[in-house]
């Protein structure tokens, strides 16, 4: 019979049928290799895991068949004396039986059992270590997720896996300062072990390491929802060729720049995951809450232009060093968007490229208001789904997947994961074999890097050589070494649909002009900010059908109906409905056709919509009134636009099913905030009140407003031309200036509109 031991819910097993029957839930099973440290490990397990029983069996007192009947949830192999082949009891057989079925953890001899079972050899470590504390570094993956570097661990061993026999299915996970291997992990199965003792009081982060093991629920990394990044194999290879005493310095000298970046990104990812609020679970929660901004179709956005420009934000690179360290990602991205870039590529790798996730975030925010905005690409060394979640949450529409860095299995997993978040990846290749892999993957956007990532040498013929392999429905992009219109023309002639330009744009004294040159665009095709055409006319305070007809017949563009209770200009609801019917069945006298302009800002685009409306636009004016009241008037009168003339919250704008004009004082910092109001209305404020007061705005100061805006306050038929000349508004708004004795004067309305339209 099993007996209870004083370690939480653990039981010491005797493998009898009764013992098996006693376990109602699936247990975590510890195989005890006759070592006193076994119970320290068990204590950690029982303190960390309260949901399932923990059963301990000596390695020669239970068979694997009997163990299988227990249907264990997880398997732990304890430390122990001797050699795993001679003294490990059922450990090796148990590993073989349960590999890929349940998570397995090996400690000290337990690791040696894993090593030997997978085809490696265990031999003398060259020294006897007993209670020695060493510093180790690790890869930040698997059970090391969220654990910092350079931690202290306690070692008790005289044997170790012979690294020259390291099985291909295992990866080195941790090592001492002088290169002695301290951990290994199976590449596919959720099997991992350490040579040191995480349960020792002198070992740092032992509980965290064991907790990561306990968090697993399945026998493979993939089933646990973990895409294990391709490891940097330079360390493994060097250790096979040398003894355990090979130094990490010697190993690093054999690494290519790509391998160095790869290794550093593994460390960066691990450090990010352990920050409060940035764990994998946290990021998944944010995605589930739909916190990520909307995503556009990367493939379709590229198809809109040929050639499509993928303009890059890049401060530095390993091959060129510093390029433009003071570059502001937001300004750079907006500049690219305004000249018609289809994609903004943002380097986020911090050490060699001097980028950051913040660059990605601000680049997206900067172009969010641009009409038909460019897609945002996170360009980085993507090796972990965590990076893809980061990208989506920070506004990316696509991520870069480099075939040279990933195994076929990992490439497929990351590709599918990106697609599951709505992002079509850009798959990068450098040779025919990689191109074949990308095509078989089903990639819709394939980029050829003319730069070999191992040597960083550029061969501009690489793209040309691979172009003929690409199916017709796949977008082919040239990703490097492009610095002139001639390069763009050359690739376009060979079927390349998109070009990525980074360094040349970053170094250009006038990036906008250089981008226009690359795309062969004239300056007239580029959005250049504020409108300089004849302003639209809005007559506010209209409260009769006759006045509305006069406005339309005279060429007015917008009719303002005031629904503010205390206003002397409040319109009767029945009259408002009559005016609405008339307005929506009458064509405007002056209609401005939409222009084919690249990279329009939010406000320019909204102005174009106003100017091109086929009928006059009906504007309902409200001031500090309930949201539901405004909604009811919108529905009853069929308003085209809502004008908020009070202190209404910005968030209301997205709750109203109509475009919104919002009033601001001249000194407001919110005037040019995009994605909310379609145009700001600038009015004079007297005693905190605005609208219909007959007070003028400072026209000279208004001329510096950087976006299309509505000018109101003190305008009359006599001064409106001067006001327009000085302040350059997109729309002029009049109410008291076309009244006589408090009533709308039809002749003044005609005179005001004519004065504007004859400019």
From Swiss-Prot:
According to the UniProt record, where is the region N-(5'-phosphoribosyl)anthranilate isomerase? 536-759
**Database matches in PROSITE patterns:** GATASE_TYPE_1 (PS51273), IGPS (PS00614)
Reactions catalysed, semicolon-separated, are: N-(5-phospho-beta-D-ribosyl)anthranilate = 1-(2-carboxyphenylamino)-1-deoxy-D-ribulose 5-phosphate; 1-(2-carboxyphenylamino)-1-deoxy-D-ribulose 5-phosphate + H(+) = (1S,2R)-1-C-(indol-3-yl)glycerol 3-phosphate + CO2 + H2O; chorismate + L-glutamine = anthranilate + pyruvate + L-glutamate + H(+)
- GO CC field: anthranilate synthase complex; cytosol
Q: Which Pfam families match?
A: GATase, IGPS, PRAI
Q: Where is the signal peptide?
A: none
Q: What does this protein do?
A: Trifunctional enzyme bearing the Gln amidotransferase (GATase) domain of anthranilate synthase, indole-glycerolphosphate synthase, and phosphoribosylanthranilate isomerase activities.
**Enzyme Commission (EC) number:** 4.1.3.27, 4.1.1.48, 5.3.1.24
SUPFAM superfamilies, alphabetized: Class I glutamine amidotransferase-like (SSF52317), Ribulose-phoshate binding barrel (SSF51366)
- Keywords linked to the UniProt accession: Amino-acid biosynthesis, Aromatic amino acid biosynthesis, Decarboxylase, Glutamine amidotransferase, Isomerase, Lyase, Multifunctional enzyme, Tryptophan biosynthesis
Pathway terms, separated by semicolons: Amino-acid biosynthesis; L-tryptophan biosynthesis; L-tryptophan from chorismate: step 1/5; Amino-acid biosynthesis; L-tryptophan biosynthesis; L-tryptophan from chorismate: step 3/5; Amino-acid biosynthesis; L-tryptophan biosynthesis; L-tryptophan from chorismate: step 4/5
The GO terms this record gives for MF are:
anthranilate synthase activity; indole-3-glycerol-phosphate synthase activity; phosphoribosylanthranilate isomerase activity
Please name the GO terms of the biological process aspect recorded for this protein, alphabetically: L-tryptophan biosynthetic process
Nucleotide-binding: is it a keyword of this entry?
Answer: no
Keyword Nucleotide-binding in record: no
Identify which residues the record assigns to the active site.
Answer: 108, 197, 199
Which InterPro entries does the UniProt record give? Aldolase_TIM (IPR013785), Anthranilate_synth_II (IPR016302), Class_I_gatase-like (IPR029062), GATASE (IPR017926), Indole-3-glycerol_P_synth (IPR045186), Indole-3-glycerol_P_synth_dom (IPR013798), Indole-3-GlycerolPSynthase_CS (IPR001468), PRAI_dom (IPR001240)
Q: What is this protein called?
A: Multifunctional tryptophan biosynthesis protein
Location of the region described as Indole-3-glycerol phosphate synthase in the Swiss-Prot/TrEMBL record: 257-519
Tell me which residues bind L-glutamine: 80-82, 112, 158-159
Name the cystine pairs: none
Q: Which PANTHER family does the entry mention?
A: INDOLE-3-GLYCEROL-PHOSPHATE SYNTHASE, TRYPTOPHAN BIOSYNTHESIS PROTEIN
Ranges where the Glutamine amidotransferase type-1 domain occurs: 27-223
């Amino acid at each position: 019979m099993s007996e209870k031991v004083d370690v939480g819910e653990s039981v010491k097993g005797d493998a009898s049928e009764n013992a098996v029957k006693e376990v109602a839930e699936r247990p975590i099973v510890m195989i005890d290799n006759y070592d006193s440290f076994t119970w320290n490990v068990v204590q950690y397990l029982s303190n960390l895991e309260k949901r399932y029983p923990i059963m301990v069996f000596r390695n020669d007192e239970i068979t694997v068949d009997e163990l299988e009947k227990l249907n264990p949830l997880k398997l732990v192999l304890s430390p122990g004396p001797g050699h795993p082949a001679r003294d490990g009891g059922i450990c090796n057989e148990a590993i073989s039986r349960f590999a890929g079925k349940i998570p397995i953890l090996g400690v000290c001899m337990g690791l040696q059992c894993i090593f030997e079972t997978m085809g490696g050899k265990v031999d003398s470590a060259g020294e006897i270590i007993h209670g020695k504390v060493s510093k180790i570094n690790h890869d930040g993956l698997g059970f090391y997720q969220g654990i910092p570097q350079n931690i202290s661990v306690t070692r008790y061993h005289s044997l170790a896996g012979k690294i020259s026999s390291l099985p291909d299915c295992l990866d080195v996970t941790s090592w001492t300062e002088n290169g002695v291997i301290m951990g290994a992990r199976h590449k596919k199965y959720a099997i991992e072990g350490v040579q040191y003792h995480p349960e020792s009081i002198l070992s740092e982060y032992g509980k965290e390491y064991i907790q990561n093991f306990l968090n697993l629920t399945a026998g493979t990394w993939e089933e646990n929802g973990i895409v294990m990044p391709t490891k940097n194999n330079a360390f493994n290879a060097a250790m096979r060729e040398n003894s355990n005493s090979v130094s990490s310095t010697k190993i690093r000298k054999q690494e290519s720049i790509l391998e160095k970046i790869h290794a550093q990104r593994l460390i960066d990812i691990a450090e990010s995951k352990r920050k409060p609020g940035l764990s994998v679970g946290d990021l998944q929660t944010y995605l589930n809450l739909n916190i990520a901004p909307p995503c556009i179709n990367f493939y379709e956005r590229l198809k809109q232009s040929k050639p499509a420009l993928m303009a890059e934000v890049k401060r530095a690179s390993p091959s060129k060093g510093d390029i433009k360290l003071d570059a502001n990602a937001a300004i750079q991205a907006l500049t690219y968007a305004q000249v018609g870039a289809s994609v903004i590529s943002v380097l986020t790798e911090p050490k060699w490229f001097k980028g950051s996730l913040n660059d990605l975030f601000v680049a997206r925010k900067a172009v969010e208001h641009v009409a038909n905005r460019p897609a945002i690409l996170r360009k980085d060394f993507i090796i972990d789904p965590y990076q893809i979640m980061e990208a989506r949450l920070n506004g990316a529409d696509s991520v870069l997947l480099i075939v040279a860095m990933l195994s076929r299995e990992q490439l497929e997993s990351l590709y599918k994961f990106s697609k599951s978040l709505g992002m079509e990846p850009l798959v990068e290749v450098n040779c025919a074999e990689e191109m074949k892999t990308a095509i078989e993957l089903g990639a819709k956007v394939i980029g050829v890097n003319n730069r070999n990532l191992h040597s960083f040498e550029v061969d501009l013929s690489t793209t040309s050589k691979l172009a003929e392999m690409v199916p017709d429905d796949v977008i082919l992009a040239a990703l490097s070494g492009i610095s002139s219109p001639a390069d763009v023309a050359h690739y376009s002639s060979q079927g390349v649909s998109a070009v990525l330009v980074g360094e040349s744009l970053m170094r250009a004294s006038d990036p906008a002009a250089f981008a226009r040159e690359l795309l062969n665009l004239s300056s007239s095709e580029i959005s250049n900010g504020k409108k300089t055409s004849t302003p639209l006319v809005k007559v506010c305070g209209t409260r009769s059908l006759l006045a509305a007809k006069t406005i339309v017949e005279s060429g007015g563009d917008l009719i303002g109906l005031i629904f503010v209770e205390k206003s002397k200009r409040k319109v009767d609801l029945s009259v408002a409905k009559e005016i609405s019917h008339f307005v929506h069945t009458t064509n405007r006298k002056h209609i401005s056709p939409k222009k084919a302009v690249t990279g329009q800002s939010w406000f320019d685009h909204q102005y174009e919509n106003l100017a091109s409306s086929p009928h006059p636009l009906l504007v309902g004016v409200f001031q500090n009134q309930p949201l539901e009241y405004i909604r009811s008037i919108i529905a009853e009168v069929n308003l085209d636009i809502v004008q908020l003339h009070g202190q209404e919250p910005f968030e209301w704008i997205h709750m109203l099913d109509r475009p919104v004009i919002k009033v601001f004082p001249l000194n407001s910092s919110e005037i040019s905030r995009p994605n909310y109001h379609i145009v700001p209305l600038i009015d004079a404020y007297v005693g905190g009140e605005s609208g219909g007061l007959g007070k003028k705005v400072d026209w000279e100061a208004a001329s510096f407003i950087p976006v299309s805006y509505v000018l109101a306050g003190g305008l009359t038929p006599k001064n409106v031309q001067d006001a327009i000349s000085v302040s350059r508004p997109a729309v002029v708004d009049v109410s008291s200036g076309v009244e006589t004795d408090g009533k709308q004067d039809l002749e003044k309305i005609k005179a005001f509109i004519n004065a504007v339209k004859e400019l």
